Amino acid sequence: MEININEVLFVIPARGGSKRLPKKNIKPLAGKPLICYSLDIARQLTDDGNICISTDSDDIISVVSDCGYHVPFKRPDELASDTATTNDVLVHAVNYYKQLGMDYKYLVLLQVTSPLRRKEDITNVLSLIDDTCDMVVSVRKSHAASVMCRSEERRVGKECRSRWSPYH
């Protein structure tokens, strides 16, 4: 099944309030802000009108503006909290575009923290969608060292030789 790329909304969620690595979404990676990798790959597939960077951060807005991208809206504070889910952010973005009369058939989530994806990765995933498959999720094999556990104090972390350390 051939997908019309203009029926695809590419959403790049980029919250400004990272706790473990402040401003991680705009930190340079190989001389380029991390978020720009996701924006660039989306631009290889579609035009800016089908790309939504959902952010609450003026710094992120400034960085992507320097790349010539106009952020369509600033994410509401309640969707930039530690308790807001990615699903909440995606629903907000889809509803924003619906109010503008743009009803996308497909949604591609581009996490800023996955900068190594290629155009072919996305087109290959989109080619998997058909009448019997309406959702595709990319995953990777997990290593035992990455398994998250919860202590009796309800802290989330990873167990390293019977000691707790923050999960990375």
Residue ranges and their predicted role:
Residues L34-N50, S62:
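A short, N-terminal amphipathic alpha-helix
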Residues E7-I12, I35, N50-I53:
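Hydrophobic targeting segments
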Residues K27-P28, I53, L109:
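Conserved SAM-binding loop
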